[in-house]
């Protein structure tokens, strides 16, 4: 046969000798990269395998934002007025109570042993993106929960960002005048001067303080009247007096506006889980307060200014409950009126007999909204109530505007080459070329037998082949990013066949072979798009409450913008540096207070204000009528242990929830890099029972009962709606190294690098042995697949990027020398073959099974080590001109098997398995009697491992892949416009009078006084 030698000469066929060893493939040619072929037809989705074992729960997510508050309900019909009560005695104002600590969370149960893992199923095809759901109706407000027992104070949180400085407060009143300074020493009398000319009359000065009387001198002889002396020089200023006391503290200035929030800090590393504290001792129940008389029901009218509270009346007989009325529209919220003076506290009356609950009255028609009252002074916030049961999950909101394009992902792993097509017929011999220099090639082998034709894939539509341009003078560029798959081109017209014979007919498609052995783990793929995260477990309680901000005006909900058309994908630029936070906007001027507008849409929830002191414990009121059942509130934290209740009867089973429609499968994103293995979160609390009726109005807290024996477990209700998407958890600590993976098969040899072969270097010194890595947790052994048919050798990939130079390893043992082949005469290089026709792209192979993660081996020492495991396939190189198919040579003698390379790095996490079918609904149980809230149970012993579940049918499409890496930081936004002035806050409490300040410095000396009388 004809061919090229390494020097580029032509070889002519010589005498046929025995087959030499197969040469290495040459480096890639300098030709331009060919166009990407049309994508092949997608393969049939594989049937779903058995469900794998459930993974450990993820780390707890951060607490979600509180939901919007519901609109207040309408007041019921007014009951008959009770008799006028006697005026009570004035009560003393109670001291404000302290805010209670949050109650303990329930103790987590012990984690059960994991059951044996079922065989891993093949990943299901991704579903299409579902249409955006409509916004659900707004939930009604849940009833206020009772305050929980005080929990231990949380650890101090990190200091928040410093807010902008507020405006300076008003100047305080002037302090008291300082003490007068000490009198200076009397100066000596100067000599009498000559009489000066009389000057103009001076301004009369303020009288100075009288000086101390001097000692009486001896009486002198009366002298003659002398001339008036000249005006003496001003005396030296006296010694400064002691500083005065500080003035009284002025009233506190108005609170400045809250500064703009500081930039969000980086997420801290998750702390190690704290040790579980001991269960506290059960506290003694507090005394039951005296039940006060119920006040008369107010008449429903227009909401006006708040009047002074009237005297407390005696409890009247409970009226009959009216029938339900037609439900009116909720009126607009009026502004709270000014707080009236507190009425005198009456003496508590005797507790009346508890009346039977009346029938539910019909809610009255909604009154017209009253005029906007004046802003009242803020009341003291009450103790925090317990969080109510979770409300119904709202429907998915409208999709937001498209975000900025993400950063360019990593280059994907080169796909495996398709099956080799059938060998074409040999072309006609070319003209004999000029004999070149003798090459280093071995003798040509004799024609081998043609191998069995592999099953060709379904041929995709062949695109029109463009004319190949001349090779450019530049260097070969790096492979660009993979563009979006183009639409399949129309089948091109059959071209004129060249000198080459047409390829043989395609054989029938063979049956699907058994899965091959698990290959070596490839490098991690590019980052996938951001997936819809599953709800995380409740996170740990955050740091202590930060400083409260001012309550902002509720903004109007903006209309959802229409999603814009998808733009062309641009070239990914380098990741920019994090932009600096924008400048603080200038504070706008306070505008005039306008008339009350209509009820606005519910605004975003403002930041919680500072907790005020708890008010005094009020007298216990009479039991009220049973209210309408309210909607379920959000799920509360586990309260303190309650008294033992009576064993409840077996509850009724919940209604089986309807199975949701499977959403359309979204486009499959590229596999993201493996994230760090987070801590295994503690098992979350048991979900609330589904399909529970709305709770009634809040009753008075009863006395603590005894702890009863635990009742029988009720049947499990239907699963609740999925919770909101949890915030992204912090980066978890690195997991332990897994067991060593099996050595993979030796891959095809890569192309030789440019340059001549250098002489072998001297052996370096042997390095010290590395420290052994930590013992990994032994993984469960997967199902061993049947060995598949050995595939044909693929095309060699481009040389991958050079890795970090390894340390010098110990010199490998010399392999056994193979039998030397007979050296044949050097043949002349044959003429260059003509370009063959481009074959149709092969079918996409079925995805291989995930390899078991291997431990990361110790870094080897530098120097020539044993041959390593085959590297990951390089990026696809440019398509060179198709060469002429040569005759297949005989198989050369097998070389010595290289030692197994080190185990590859841990592969990316596999896709999430399909969701199993919903279990059958249990039989209906009897409705249980509502018992007292029991104590949170102590941690029970670990249960026995459960039996592996049976393989369910194919579930719905799995969720989207793991969240990709964060996109490049956007440029800082423009400075915001001046915001609307916020409402004038209520006046703050009057500050206390400050302590007297130090004595101020003495004032300047006054002008000299007028001369005294003679």
Curated annotation (Swiss-Prot):
A Pfam family recorded for this sequence: Collagen
Domain of life: Eukaryota
Cellular component terms per the entry's GO annotation: extracellular region
Region of interest (Disordered), residue spans: 1-1014
Compositionally skewed regions (Low complexity) per UniProt: 9-22, 33-51, 113-129, 147-165, 213-252, 372-398, 407-426, 485-494, 608-622, 635-665, 691-707, 736-745, 757-769, 900-914, 948-981
Residues with PTM 4-hydroxyproline: 25, 28, 30, 39, 42, 45, 60, 75, 81, 90, 96, 123, 126, 132, 141, 147, 168, 177, 180, 207, 210, 222, 228, 237, 243, 246, 261, 270, 273, 285, 294, 309, 315, 324, 330, 348, 357, 363, 369, 378, 381, 390, 399, 405, 417, 426, 435, 438, 456, 473, 479, 485, 491, 497, 503, 515, 524, 535, 548, 554, 563, 581, 596, 602, 623, 629, 632, 641, 647, 674, 683, 695, 701, 710, 719, 722, 743, 752, 760, 769, 787, 796, 799, 805, 820, 826, 832, 841, 847, 867, 870, 873, 945, 948, 966, 981, 987, 1002, 1005, 1008, 1011, 1014
Biased composition (Gly residues): 319-328
Phosphoserine PTM positions: 105, 611
Sequence ranges of Pro residues compositional bias: 167-179, 819-829, 864-879, 999-1014
Residue positions with a glycan: 99, 930
Location within or outside the cell: Secreted; Secreted, Extracellular space; Secreted, Extracellular space, Extracellular matrix
Biased composition (Basic and acidic residues): 63-77, 915-929
Note: These protein fragments were extracted from an ancient rib bone collected at Bariloche in Argentina and estimated to be around 19050 years old.
Family of this protein: Belongs to the fibrillar collagen family.
Name of the protein in question: Collagen alpha-1(I) chain
């Amino acid at each position: 046969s004809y061919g090229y030698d390494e020097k580029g000469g032509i070889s002519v066929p010589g005498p046929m000798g025995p087959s030499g060893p197969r040469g290495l493939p040459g480096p890639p040619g300098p030709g331009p990269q060919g166009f990407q072929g049309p994508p092949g037809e997608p393969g049939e989705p594989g049937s779903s395998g058995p469900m794998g074992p459930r993974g450990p729960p993820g780390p707890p997510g951060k607490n979600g934002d509180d939901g919007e508050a519901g609109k207040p309900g309408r007041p019921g019909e007014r009951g008959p007025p009770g008799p006028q009560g006697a005026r009570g005695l004035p009560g003393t104002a109670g001291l404000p109570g302290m805010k209670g600590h949050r109650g303990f969370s329930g103790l987590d149960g012990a984690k059960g042993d994991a059951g044996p893992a079922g065989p891993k199923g093949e990943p299901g095809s991704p579903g299409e993106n579902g249409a955006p759901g409509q916004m659900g109706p707004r939930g009604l407000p849940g009833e206020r929960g009772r305050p929980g027992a005080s929990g231990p104070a949380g650890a101090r949180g990190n200091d928040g960002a410093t807010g902008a400085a507020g405006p300076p407060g008003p100047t305080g009143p002037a302090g008291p005048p300082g003490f007068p300074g000490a009198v200076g020493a009397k100066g000596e009398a100067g000599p009498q001067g000559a009489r000066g000319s009389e000057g103009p009359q001076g301004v009369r000065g303020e009288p100075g303080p009288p000086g101390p009387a001097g000692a009486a001198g001896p009486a002198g002889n009366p002298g003659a009247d002398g001339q008036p002396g000249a005006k003496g020089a001003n005396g030296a200023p006296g010694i400064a007096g002691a500083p005065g006391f500080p003035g009284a503290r002025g009233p506190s200035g108005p609170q400045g506006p809250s500064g703009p929030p500081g930039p969000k800090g980086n997420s801290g590393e998750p702390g190690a889980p704290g040790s579980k504290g001991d269960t506290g001792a059960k506290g003694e129940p507090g005394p039951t307060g005296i039940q006060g008389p119920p006040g008369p029901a107010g008449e429903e009218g227009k909401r006006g200014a708040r009047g002074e509270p009237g005297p407390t009346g005696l409890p009247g007989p409970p009226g009959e409950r009216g029938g339900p009325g037609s439900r009116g529209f909720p009126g607009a919220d009026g502004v709270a009126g000014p707080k009236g003076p507190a009425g005198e506290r009456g003496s508590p009356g005797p507790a009346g007999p508890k009346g039977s609950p009346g029938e539910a009255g019909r809610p009255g028609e909604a009154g017209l909204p009253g005029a906007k009252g004046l802003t009242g002074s803020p009341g003291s916030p009450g103790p925090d109530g317990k969080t109510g049961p979770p409300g119904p999950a709202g429907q998915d909101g409208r999709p937001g505007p498209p975000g900025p394009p993400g950063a360019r992902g990593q280059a994907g792993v080169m796909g495996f080459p398709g099956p080799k097509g059938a060998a074409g017929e040999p072309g006609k011999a070319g003209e004999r070329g000029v004999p070149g220099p003798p090459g280093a090639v071995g003798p040509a082998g004799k024609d081998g037998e043609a191998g069995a034709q592999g099953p060709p894939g379904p041929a995709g539509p062949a695109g029109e082949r463009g004319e190949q341009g001349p090779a450019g003078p530049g260097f070969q560029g790096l492979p660009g990013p993979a563009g979006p798959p183009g639409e399949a081109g129309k089948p091109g017209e059959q071209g004129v066949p060249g000198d080459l014979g047409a390829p043989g007919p395609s054989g029938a498609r063979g049956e699907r072979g058994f899965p091959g052995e698990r290959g070596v783990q490839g490098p991690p793929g590019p980052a996938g798009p951001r997936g819809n995260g599953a709800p995380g477990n409740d996170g740990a309680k955050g740091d202590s409450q930060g400083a409260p901000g001012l309550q902002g005006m509720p903004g109007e909900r903006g209309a959802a913008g229409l999603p814009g058309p998808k733009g062309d994908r641009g070239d990914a630029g380098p990741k920019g540096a994090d932009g600096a936070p924008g400048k603080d906007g200038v504070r706008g001027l306070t505008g005039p207070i306008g008339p009350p507008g209509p009820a606005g849409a519910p605004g975003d929830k403002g930041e919680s204000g500072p907790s005020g002191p708890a008010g005094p414990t009020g007298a216990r009121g009479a039991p009220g009528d049973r209210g309408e059942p309210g909607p379920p509130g959000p799920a509360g934290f586990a309260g303190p242990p309650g008294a033992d209740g009576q064993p409840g009867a077996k509850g009724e089973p919940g209604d089986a929830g309807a199975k949701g429609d499977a959403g359309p499968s979204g486009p499959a994103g590229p596999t993201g890099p493996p994230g760090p293995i987070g801590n295994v979160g503690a098992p979350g609390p048991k979900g609330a029972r589904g399909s529970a009726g709305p709770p009634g109005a809040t009753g008075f807290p009863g006395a603590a009962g005894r702890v009863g024996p635990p009742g029988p477990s009720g049947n499990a209700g239907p699963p609740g709606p999925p919770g909101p998407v949890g915030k992204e958890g912090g980066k978890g600590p690195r997991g332990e190294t897994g067991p060593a993976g099996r050595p993979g098969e030796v891959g095809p040899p890569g192309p030789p690098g440019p340059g001549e072969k250098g002489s072998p270097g001297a052996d370096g010194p042997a390095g010290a042995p590395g420290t052994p890595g930590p013992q990994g947790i032994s993984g469960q052994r997967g199902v061993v697949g049947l060995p598949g048919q050995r595939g044909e050798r693929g095309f060699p990939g481009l040389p991958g990027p050079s890795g970090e130079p390894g340390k010098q390893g110990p010199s490998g043992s010399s392999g056994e020398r193979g039998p030397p082949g007979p050296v044949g005469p050097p043949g002349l290089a044959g003429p260059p073959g003509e370009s063959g026709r481009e074959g149709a792209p092969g079918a996409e192979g079925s995805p291989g099974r995930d390899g078991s993660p291997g431990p990361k081996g110790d870094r080897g020492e530098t120097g020539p080590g044993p041959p390593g495991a085959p590297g990951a396939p390089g990026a696809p190189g440019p398509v060179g001109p198709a060469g002429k198919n040569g005759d297949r040579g005989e198989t050369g003698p097998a070389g010595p098997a290289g030692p197994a390379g080190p185990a590859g790095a841990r592969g990316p996490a596999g896709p999430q398995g399909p969701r199993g079918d919903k279990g059958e609904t249990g039989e209906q149980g009897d409705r249980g009697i509502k018992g007292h809230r029991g104590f949170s149970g102590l941690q029970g012993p670990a249960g026995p491992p459960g039996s592996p579940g049976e393989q369910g049918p194919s579930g719905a499409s799995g969720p989207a892949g793991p969240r990709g890496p964060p996109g490049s930081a956007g440029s800082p936004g423009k400075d915001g416009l001046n915001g609307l002035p916020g409402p004038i806050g209520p006046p703050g409490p009057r500050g206390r009078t400050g302590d007297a300040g130090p004595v101020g410095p003495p004032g300047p000396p006054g002008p000299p006084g007028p001369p005294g009388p003679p």
